[in-house]
Swiss-Prot record:
Entry keywords, A to Z: Cytoplasm
Organism: Homo sapiens
UniProt GO cellular component terms: cytoplasm
Protein name: PI-PLC X domain-containing protein 1
Gene: PLCXD1
Record PANTHER family: PI-PLC X DOMAIN-CONTAINING PROTEIN 1 (PTHR13593:SF24), PTHR13593
Transmembrane residue ranges: none
Length: 323
């Protein structure tokens, strides 16, 4: 495959690397018996976009207009698409080292691709293959036996039933006994006692029926907002409606629209996001995990490592000790 595109290094890639590498095992023992859906867990939105392929076709799920523009004016369309598609700069191992424990994996099969090669996708496809990435995650977990990850497998563009079966077989072969089968949301102590480290949510109903190792899709509160205050209002509205019963994600990721892109031709998603991180981080620090109807659980963001987001989310668990 061709070269990859990544976010610029306009922020320190070392901001929170390694400091939170083993944060779950370092939690106060009182929190080891709290179910995962009542803990505060940092996540990354569109985890794999650090390795988008400059030469890949536009995703077939994108609009017909974008497909036509890419064919007619590729030298203009492609750079614009790429700079608004990248949401992460750290690779998956660096994200795990930084403390991220929810990975948002948008999986696809390119029509032009090899029969069994699955990629990740966000408007364009990644250089990374799914099987290689899952292996990388498994190897990281072997080095961190008391850390737990939630892998949200979704999108599934171009996947036939046979490819779903192939993907699930890869998941089982790679993670083996690390997989926590579907059931009540476990605590860290329960997972540790069973040697389990991986919860796989899988947004395909037929696959769920066939494989008890897979969990239903984790709800994601996606605000689809350009402005920070509008996104925060959306999240507060969702909280007022009551949290879901199990694992769920509050996404603090801003989202561009066509009007914004046309009005800001020199910008990118990174340039739009970074100046707004202080306000988003302030909102994060106000949250509280737990069973209450307005409590948060997983909080996912863009450009992990750009600020203290991961540490802020982890620190919310201290509020559970005040109850």
């Amino acid at each position: 495959m061709g070269g990859q595109v990544s976010a610029s290094n306009s922020f320190s890639r070392l901001h929170c690397r390694n400091a939170n590498e083993d944060w779950m095992s370092a939690l106060c023992p009182r929190l080891w018996d709290v179910p995962l859906h009542h803990l505060s867990i940092p996540g990354s939105h569109d985890t794999m976009t650090y390795c988008l392929n400059k030469k890949s076709p536009i995703s077939h799920e994108e609009s017909r207009l974008l497909q036509l523009l890419n064919k007619a004016l590729p030298c203009i369309t492609r750079p614009v698409v790429l700079k608004w598609s990248v949401t992460q700069a750290l690779d998956v191992t660096e994200q795990l080292d930084a403390g991220v424990r929810y990975l948002d994996l948008r999986i696809a099969h390119m029509l032009e691709g090899s029969e069994k090669n699955l990629h990740f996708v966000h408007m364009v496809y990644t250089t990374a293959l799914v099987e290689d990435t899952l292996t990388e995650i498994s190897e990281w977990l072997e080095r961190h036996p008391r850390e737990v990850v939630i892998l949200a497998c979704r999108n599934f563009e171009g996947l036939s039933e046979d490819l779903h079966e192939y993907l699930v077989a890869c998941i089982k072969n790679i993670f083996g006994d690390m997989l926590c089968p579907r059931g009540e949301v476990p605590t860290l102590r329960q997972l540790w006692s069973r040697g389990q480290q991986v919860i796989v949510s899988y947004e395909d109903e037929s696959s769920l029926r066939r494989h008890h190792e897979l969990w239903p899709g984790v709800p994601y509160w996606w605000g689809n907002r350009v402005k920070t205050e509008a996104l925060i209002r959306y999240l507060e509205t969702m909280k007022s409606c009551g949290r879901p019963g199990g694992l769920f994600v509050a996404g603090i990721n801003l989202t561009e629209n066509l009007q914004y892109v046309l009005a800001h031709p020199s910008e990118s998603l990174e340039k739009m996001t970074l100046p707004n991180l202080p306000r988003l981080s302030a909102w994060v620090r106000e949250q509280c995990p737990g069973p209450g109807s307005r409590c948060t659980n997983i909080i996912a963001g863009d450009f992990i490592g750009a600020d203290g987001f991961v540490s802020d989310v982890i620190a919310l668990n201290q509020k559970l000790l005040w109850c």
